[in-house]
Amino acid sequence: GEAVGLPAQQMGNSEVGHLNLGAGRVVHQSLTYINRKIKDGSFFKNKCFLKVIQHVKTNKSKLHLLGLVSDGGVHSHLDHF
C-alpha cells in the first residue's frame, strides 16, 4: 500500500519491502510513478517516445513494443495495457 510507495490496497512483495526497509521515507514504486505521469499528462509528452513515434510515421515503419502485463501491480499493471 501507500506506506511502501504503492497505490492504496495494492499488495507489494519482498522487493518492495527491501527497498523501503530503513530508507526513512516512502520509496515510490514504478506503478505509482507511471500512474502519476499518466494522470498529469506528462507520460504522453515524453520527448524520446514522441521522437520514435515521429520516426515511425515519417518512415512508414513499424514499432514493436515489449512489456509486462500482469495484475501483480509491482512490475506491471493491467491498467497500463
From Swiss-Prot:
Q: What UniProt keywords apply to this chain's record, in alphabetical order?
A: Glycolysis, Isomerase, Manganese, Metal-binding
Which Gene3D superfamilies does this one have?
Answer: BPG-independent phosphoglycerate mutase, domain B (3.40.1450.10)
Disulphide bond pairs: none
Binding locations of Mn(2+):
S14
Transmembrane stretches, start-end: none
| Gene Ontology MF term list | manganese ion binding; phosphoglycerate mutase activity
Which residues are the active-site ones?
A: S14 (phosphoserine intermediate)
GO BP term, pick one: glucose catabolic process
| Cofactors, names only | Mn(2+)
Q: Does the keyword rRNA-binding apply?
A: no
Q: Which reaction does it catalyse?
A: (2R)-2-phosphoglycerate = (2R)-3-phosphoglycerate
Q: How is the cofactor bound?
A: Binds 2 manganese ions per subunit.
User: One Pfam family for this entry, by name?
Assistant: iPGM_N
The record lists substrate as bound by H75
**Cellular component GO terms held in the UniProt record:** cytosol
Q: What class of enzyme is it?
A: isomerase
Reported EC number(s) for this entry are 5.4.2.12
Q: How does it assemble?
A: Monomer.
Give the protein's function: Catalyzes the interconversion of 2-phosphoglycerate and 3-phosphoglycerate.
Task: Give the protein's recorded name.
Answer: 2,3-bisphosphoglycerate-independent phosphoglycerate mutase
